[in-house]
């Protein structure tokens, strides 16, 4: 077991009850272009086209064999584009249950499949996009091979679902998915302390337990300790529900689009786990579930998720949470003179530090305006990786990609710096800054 000591479990109220219920049915689903870094789409459909579940909506110009397939059957109702015609989302109004069939195999033959058979089925079905590389967090090139594949079966994000609850319902499919992934590379199955999961004793699968505060459950943490990456070495990672989907694909020949997500947050009337579907319309999913007022829906974690609004009002491809917060649009009178009983800080600046175990109803307010970056040891307190966070963040801010690489930027994804953004006195958002630097590093070779 690997136990980390540095990090932070955000004391936010509204944690979900770890029991799965059926969610409100949604009428539309979507693929979000923002989820796929560096992807340039070649569209295969247009508005008004009827599509089947698993039918290609677009492919990647750089890797034409990688298909991005429909998460539901119905009619393409909208293709949203932003500045410079960047793809925002492809929306499907659900209608019917037509679906494409893919290759299927008996469960006892999965361990004998070739890597080519596995790749072909994942590519044709669109489940290849469940995989992401590290460095760069992109859908991998089908011609590349990873040093290893990381399966994240632990989740320490605030308000997250317990993976063990979900996997318990789909044990056979999860084990089948691990077997299939083992045909591509060695697999690291990362889990919580004291948890036993299906398939962890399979040949080619190494189970590794992690413990400690967030980010103990992030793939970046697991990769750093088990198989670090660099300019000449890459690994792939995916979450536990995509492993289940892969197992279902290879044993049934059909896409499994069900997702169990946490519907939680301080403004949720009944925080719980809900059974919905990939790319679900979050406005419809949250209807009638929130306290009255001006609330914000976030696809993903409160630390590193994306505001779900307009063209982006759908569950992200890699997200397993719908987090809901009150909009922090009210200024507090003489807030700097208050004791801070209802505010949280990593530093000893509020009385709330004396109230151990207290949960806070966080809002979207940053509690201050942008200012200079001030290193007071807060980054080091939440960074468990063996890097120099203050120095790295400084070089990321000024855009010195050479020094950023030397200090470990290639090991990181936006979510790995989310806690640094939270504790930053200067109110910097380090995730987008990191992404800009990674894009430049990749372009410059």
From Swiss-Prot:
Its EC number is 7.2.1.1. It is an enzyme of class 7 (translocase). The keyword Transmembrane helix does not apply. Keywords: Ion transport, NAD, Sodium, Sodium transport, Translocase, Transport, Ubiquinone. It catalyses: a ubiquinone + n Na(+)(in) + NADH + H(+) = a ubiquinol + n Na(+)(out) + NAD(+). The keyword NAD applies. GO terms for molecular function: oxidoreductase activity, acting on NAD(P)H, quinone or similar compound as acceptor. GO terms for biological process: sodium ion transport. Composed of six subunits; NqrA, NqrB, NqrC, NqrD, NqrE and NqrF. NQR complex catalyzes the reduction of ubiquinone-1 to ubiquinol by two successive reactions, coupled with the transport of Na(+) ions from the cytoplasm to the periplasm. NqrA to NqrE are probably involved in the second step, the conversion of ubisemiquinone to ubiquinol. Belongs to the NqrA family. This is Na(+)-translocating NADH-quinone reductase subunit A. It comes from Pseudomonas aeruginosa (strain UCBPP-PA14). The lineage of its organism: Bacteria, Pseudomonadati, Pseudomonadota, Gammaproteobacteria, Pseudomonadales.
């Amino acid at each position: 077991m690997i136990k980390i000591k540095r990090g932070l479990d955000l004391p936010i109220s509204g944690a979900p009850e770890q029991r799965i219920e059926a969610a409100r049915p949604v009428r539309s689903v979507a693929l979000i272009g923002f989820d796929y870094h560096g992807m340039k789409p070649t569209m295969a459909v247009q508005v008004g086209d009827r599509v089947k579940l698993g039918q290609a909506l677009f492919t990647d110009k750089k890797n034409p064999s990688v298909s991005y397939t429909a998460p539901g059957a119905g009619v393409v109702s909208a293709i949203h584009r932003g500045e410079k015609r960047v793809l925002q989302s492809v929306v499907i109004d659900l209608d019917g249950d037509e679906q494409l069939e893919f290759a299927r195999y008996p469960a006892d033959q999965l361990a004998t499949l070739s890597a080519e058979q596995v790749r072909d089925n994942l590519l044709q079905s669109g489940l290849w996009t469940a995989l992401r590389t590290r460095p760069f967090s992109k859908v991998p090139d089908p011609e590349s091979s990873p040093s290893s594949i990381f399966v994240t079966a632990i989740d320490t994000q605030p308000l997250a679902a317990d993976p063990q609850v979900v996997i318990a319902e789909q044990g056979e499919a999860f084990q089948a998915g691990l077997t299939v992934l083992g045909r591509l590379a060695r697999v690291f199955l990362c889990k919580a302390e004291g948890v036993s999961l299906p398939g962890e004793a399979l040949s080619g699968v190494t189970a590794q337990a992690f413990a400690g505060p967030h980010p103990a459950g992030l793939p970046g943490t697991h990769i750093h300790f088990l198989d670090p990456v660099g300019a000449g070495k890459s690994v792939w990672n995916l979450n536990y529900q995509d492993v289940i989907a892969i197992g279902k694909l290879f044993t049934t020949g059909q896409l499994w689009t069900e997702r169990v997500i946490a519907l939680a947050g301080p403004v949720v009337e009944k925080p719980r786990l809900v059974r919905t579907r990939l790319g679900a319309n979050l406005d419809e999913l949250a209807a009638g579930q929130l306290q009255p007022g001006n609330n914000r829906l976030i696809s993903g974690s409160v630390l590193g998720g994306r505001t779900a609004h307009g063209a982006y009002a759908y569950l992200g491809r890699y997200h397993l949470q719908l987090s809901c917060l009150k909009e922090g649009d009210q200024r507090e009178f003489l807030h700097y003179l208050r004791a801070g009983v209802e505010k949280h800080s990593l530093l000893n600046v509020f009385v709330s530090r004396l109230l151990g175990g207290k949960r806070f109803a966080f809002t979207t307010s940053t509690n201050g305006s942008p200012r200079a970056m001030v290193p007071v040891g807060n980054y080091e307190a939440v960074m468990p990786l063996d890097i120099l966070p203050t120095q790295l963040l400084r070089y990321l801010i000024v855009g010195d990609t050479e020094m950023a690489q030397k200090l470990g930027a290639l090991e990181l994804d936006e979510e790995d710096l989310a806690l640094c953004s939270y504790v930053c006195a200067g109110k910097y958002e380090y995730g987008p800054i990191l992404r800009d630097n990674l894009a430049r590093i990749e372009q410059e070779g």
